[in-house]
Amino acid sequence: MTKGPVRLDVGVSYALPRTGLPSSVSFRKWVAAALKGRIREADLAVRVVDEKEGCSLNHHYRGKDYATNVLSFPAEMPQGLPKGVKMPLLGDLVICAPVVAREAAEQGKSLSAHYAHLTVHGTLHLLGWDHEDDKEADAMEQLEREILAELGIDDPYAGER
């Protein structure tokens, strides 16, 4: 665990009208909760997109012909940095607003809680967490539960198993 103050720069952009979407302050709070005790300095971008852009990105980067709720793009360290130099750029999150809204309604979750969950989930991917097998998924889901509980948000996986 990392102790001490955290320097966090979260840039948020919206590719559709902001009405009903979380504020940049909310996204920053959720990212900060996911990073708390794990990293001391981070720059990342969050882009909220429509279904067309979400589908295009998911097709281009994952070969899937549908929009997904969140995509994580970890930053790559540039070549030639001196040994030991760390770059604070963590990466980018792309969140597809129509998919998030549809899932929240289908799952009976508040829209804000679902955005918080997916922001935490995507941020953990930027930190290297994954869910390719059951053991990884269980560990990542437990960490998500703990982070969301600190934010006062109910277990997003309750009732799934």
From Swiss-Prot:
One of its GO terms (cellular component) is cytoplasm. InterPro entries: MetalPrtase_cat_dom_sf_prd, YbeY, YbeY_CS. Its EC number is 3.1.-.-. Its cofactor is Zn(2+). One of its GO terms (biological process) is rRNA processing. Binds 1 zinc ion. It is found in: Cytoplasm. Zn(2+) binds at residues 121, 125, 131. GO terms for molecular function: metalloendopeptidase activity; RNA endonuclease activity; zinc ion binding. It comes from the Bacteria. SUPFAM superfamilies: Metalloproteases ('zincins'), catalytic domain (SSF55486). Its main location: cytoplasm. Pfam families: YbeY. Keywords: Cytoplasm, Endonuclease, Hydrolase, Metal-binding, Nuclease, Ribosome biogenesis, rRNA processing, Zinc. NCBIfam families: rRNA maturation RNase YbeY. Single strand-specific metallo-endoribonuclease involved in late-stage 70S ribosome quality control and in maturation of the 3' terminus of the 16S rRNA. Belongs to the endoribonuclease YbeY family. This is Endoribonuclease YbeY. It comes from Xanthomonas campestris pv. campestris (strain ATCC 33913 / DSM 3586 / NCPPB 528 / LMG 568 / P 25). The lineage of its organism: Bacteria, Pseudomonadati, Pseudomonadota, Gammaproteobacteria, Lysobacterales.
